[in-house]
């Protein structure tokens, strides 16, 4: 059931995006055809998960703040779960959500979408949470960076029925997190900055916010599979 809900919702969104907005996806050739994958992106609006899922065209799963599940009807909660969302308690180490994510990522075709900022930041990127690092390190799978521009105008989820404006989704090259063992706090923050820098470099400078310098820095904790990488 979840697969069909996800596929139907994404197809419907692609239709409305094509009809009512100037919607373009760049870098689709960077999306791995198979294998488990973590997707990381900047977070501008409530419709970001849907925009991202319809762009990468994989059966994505999401970690979503638990308050979203608490503020909707039972039918709304059913749809959220059917679409692939799982509640995450923010402000603490949610071990239940972490176990769920790691279990999901064992599936051969798993796609887990994360917004490291943890909350919407319309316009420019803000500081990300460090939880992405231990999760990605334990999973040991490719990470796909995505930069979304122009989505900040879609503040209401109802906007998916009539999106407007220019929306750009830019998909970067997959990369790996090169860490072993437990990192110090400083190294963890540096790894987070690199992950966010790989998102920021896909965005206009005005969107980069706290990660303007990270987008231009040398990458140490992350690398792609290409010899030409940093």
Tell me what each language-model feature is.
Residues 1-22, 218:
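N-terminal membrane-anchoring alpha-helices
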Residues 12-14, 82-88, 115-120:
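Short, basic, glycine/proline-bearing loop/turn elements
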Residues 25, 62, 85-87, 143-145, ...:
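Conserved beta-strand scaffold positions in the cores of enzyme catalytic domains, especially
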